[in-house]
Amino acid sequence: MSQFILAIDQGTTSSRAILFNHEGQIHGVAQQEYPQIFPEPGWVEHDANAIWNSQLAVARQVLKENKLSATDIAAIGITNQRETTVIWDRKTGQPIANAIVWQDRRTAAYCDQLRAEGKADLFQQKTGLVLDSYFSGTKVKWLLDHIPDARARAERGELAFGTIDSWLVYKLSGAHLTDSSNASRTLLFNIHTLQWDEELLAIFDIPASLLPAVVASSGIASHTHTELFGAPIAIAGIAGDQQAATFGQACHKPGMAKNTYGTGCFMLLNTGTHAISSHNNLLTTIGWTLGIGKAAQTNYMLEGGVFMGGAIVQWLRDGLGIIQRSADVEALATSVPDNGGVVFVPAFSGLGAPYWDSYARGTILGMTRGSNKAHIARAALESIAYQSVDLLDAMQKDAQSSSQELRVDGGASRNDLLMQFQADILNVPVIRPVVTETTALGAAYLAGLAVSFWQSAEEITAQWKMDKRFEPAMSADEREQRLHTWHRAVERAQAWES
């Protein structure tokens, strides 16, 4: 009997493979970093072959290190950095260019043009998304417009487009498909009809033949090529990283929310089978689709994402050089009692939700001769929490409800100073689970449900366990004053490049 689910977790800076047992516990991990490519200011790319090679290597490595074979694996679940765009040749399987990463801003001016033409409402109504260069649609158009002969080849059906999940499924199995959660991040998918939208494709001049088939997030979608692992393994779960994390956090009921502190920060609120249209610059997105045919049920989410979360700490390490390791930031920040009046707005790539300002830029305010690197480190950590306050406030307005708790995960959730400040500034309890690898766990759960490795969402919920609960301890007056100062600082950072 197969004892494990293999989760493939393809992230912005690394590829990982994680084995989970029946109890939802980690049995083995393998990870390999790969480089980002920055050809021009505001451009961010990946070598799609480097992604595939690293992902295959870690999948094989985790099996080898744990003395397992393909027959020990019940299924594979895939979770991935979303929106990142790959176009490849259907015959050769080779990309026609580097992948354009979700962080890439090269199509910002084109998005401005579409907004000026009055197209923003149409896109929001159909896709639930704001018209921003963050999403895949404008990246696909850019590649078709700028890579020689790409559009003609696409129209002849020679090329395939996919987000990273599609690319991995294609390399693993030869199938060209995606799931509803990833499709909902493209600006091309109607989240109400659950179909690629012809009107939106026409605006971008994207041939429908380029697009993958859309399948459920939980269900046997394909099987791996025999030669990769020695025997075929079912690919039975697919979800974008943030949707997978929400599922892994057992936020299965409407009103439950989670925040993932990764490269960026992403907060999702489950709204059940009802797609709530945001009036506060949030995204309405598909969380997951379970079941097939008439039994299929799609869950929707409100989402807010900020571009700079843990990446701020990386900048403190690599850009400023004030820490040697990312883990050192907590000790440095706690070496001072407060931020000394320093406020940090980390708008290095603009501001995400709820501002959506591509032209904002990073700002450090309140510096005096008494300011030092510890104050900057503390202000940097606090900026992650402040951005998350803006997200939850907007969500509660849209959902017309108050959250009773916020479940957290991702690398920075291990930082107790940040988590306590997050609870204080939100005035909501923050709960960290025992397993913080919830993105990979969510992909594993989706795959496991499809092959009856787990029987139900209720069984998964019963496995979720709390590690630590952070209760708010800040006075209302202090909270109000701090938030007022934060919003003043955001105003200074906005529209800097316009």
Swiss-Prot record:
Keyword hit for Transferase:
yes
Cleavable signal peptide: none
Enzyme's top EC category: transferase
**UniProt binding sites for glycerol:** R82, E83, Y134, D241, Q242
Q: How is its activity regulated?
A: Inhibited by fructose 1,6-bisphosphate (FBP).
Catalytic reaction list? glycerol + ATP = sn-glycerol 3-phosphate + ADP + H(+)
Record field: transmembrane = none
Q: What is its EC number?
A: 2.7.1.30
Q: Which residues bind sn-glycerol 3-phosphate?
A: T12, R82, E83, Y134, D241
Q: Which UniProt keywords apply?
A: ATP-binding, Glycerol metabolism, Kinase, Nucleotide-binding, Transferase
Q: Which Pfam families match?
A: FGGY_C, FGGY_N
What role is this protein assigned? Key enzyme in the regulation of glycerol uptake and metabolism. Catalyzes the phosphorylation of glycerol to yield sn-glycerol 3-phosphate.
The UniProt family comment states: Belongs to the FGGY kinase family.
Q: Specify the protein name.
A: Glycerol kinase
The organism named in the record is: Janthinobacterium sp. (strain Marseille)
